[in-house]
């Protein structure tokens, strides 16, 4: 079993300290008196559960889909410019962005215009994920993370590959998100899955969320 999935209270305290350090960029970019986004100042609780993932549809300056994978007490995050595709022939650009707090996995709403990332955010998919083979932190460091998603919309094996021009630098980088060929792949599917536009947490459309209409999103529960 991946030792990142089971950790004691002492390790949880360490993870909280690491997460707070890694969230410094996230916090510096936001005025929490003007945005409803979580500040990420809650402690990381010990859990034996699988790692969580979320995909958020984000109508900012440009519409994109934010892929977030839980790792070491934060969400490692990528802005997938055209959204995920189940067609293995499609290589979707995924721009690495700052780490986000785990509480962001339940965020759905509007970010005020003028704030960083201003626009509407919808919980488009969520579930659990697992790395295939190599330790996920090591895989990310080498620029080749193979993983399996168990979501409400996305399933099966995927890979995030850091583009070669960005492999020798420590800066945030451009990656490619690619679906592996398996039983969940859909060749020729392209953007068909993206047409399914309701929130997995509230059922709301982007327009409903922007207008503040409809049900409050249901928080995700492990297990």
Language-model segments: what does each one mean?
Residues 2-223:
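A charge-rich, low-complexity, intrinsically flexible signal that marks solvent-exposed coils, linkers
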């Amino acid at each position: 079993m991946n030792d990142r999935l089971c950790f004691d209270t002492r390790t949880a305290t360490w993870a909280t300290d690491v997460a707070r350090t890694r969230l410094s960029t996230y916090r510096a970019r936001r005025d929490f008196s003007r945005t409803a986004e979580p500040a990420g100042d809650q402690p990381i609780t010990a859990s034996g559960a699988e790692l969580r993932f979320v995909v958020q549809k984000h109508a900012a300056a440009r519409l994109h889909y934010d892929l977030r994978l839980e790792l070491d007490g934060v969400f490692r995050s990528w802005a997938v410019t055209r959204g995920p595709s189940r067609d293995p022939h499609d290589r979707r650009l995924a721009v690495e962005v700052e780490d986000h707090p785990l509480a962001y996995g339940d965020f759905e709403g509007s970010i005020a215009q003028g704030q960083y990332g201003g626009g509407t955010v919808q919980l488009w998919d969520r579930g659990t994920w697992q790395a295939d083979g190599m330790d996920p932190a090591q895989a990310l460091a080498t620029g080749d993370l193979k993983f399996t998603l168990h979501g409400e919309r996305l399933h099966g094996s995927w890979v995030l590959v850091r583009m070669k021009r960005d492999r020798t630098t420590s800066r945030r980088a451009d990656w490619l998100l690619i679906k592996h060929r398996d039983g969940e792949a859909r060749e020729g599917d392209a953007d068909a899955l993206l047409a399914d536009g309701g929130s997995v947490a509230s059922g709301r459309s982007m327009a409903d969320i922007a207008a503040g209409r409809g049900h409050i999103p249901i928080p995700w529960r492990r297990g």
